[in-house]
Amino acid sequence: LIRAYVDVETDEMKALTVVGVFRPDRGAKQWVRPNFSRFDFLNFLSGVESVMTYNGARFDLPLIKEQLGADVESLFRHRDLMLDCWANNLYGGLKKVEAQLGIHRDTEGVDGLQAIRLWHAHRRGETGALDLLLRYNREDVENLEALALKLGVVGKVGPAPARRPAGQGDVHERART
């Protein structure tokens, strides 16, 4: 089963700034605004059977569909690992879940808000800002595989369980940090 892990970074207006994909068989690839290409993105996913995200059904994939014109959920099986986490009583954003499971991160302290700040720092020409943003996104996509392995869902396809945490309705903000 060939799988890919997808994560995006955005600015405060939810415009894509970085799109990252990790394929265990090919490594990571990232696209930075304005150099997005629907063709390149889908070409990199060619041969993939399953795409995994964290909160991707509500955040990443709708933005990719709207802004890149790539409907990932109609082209590939999608598994949102956030739902698997909920089924295992692991709640919170990706970084919080990683910490609970002992998944290491070199970009400790960088979160979604900091990613927005890094994007603006890059746009102002600050040295190193884009590099740190790309390392952060790369860790996101690579750590999704570590998360899937810890959850034991790597060989599974199709949607994750749809169990919502007790007392939580729809989350309208991004549950990633």
Question: What is each PLM-predicted segment?
Answer:
Residues L1-D11, N137:
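Two-metal-ion RNase H-like nuclease active-site motif
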Residues T10, R26-V32, A129-D131:
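Surface-exposed cleft-lining segments at the edges of enzyme active sites
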Residues M13-D25:
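Short conserved beta-strand segments at catalytic cores or DNA/RNA-binding microdomains
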Residues L81-L90, P165-A175:
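Short, flexible loop segments at boundaries between secondary-structure elements
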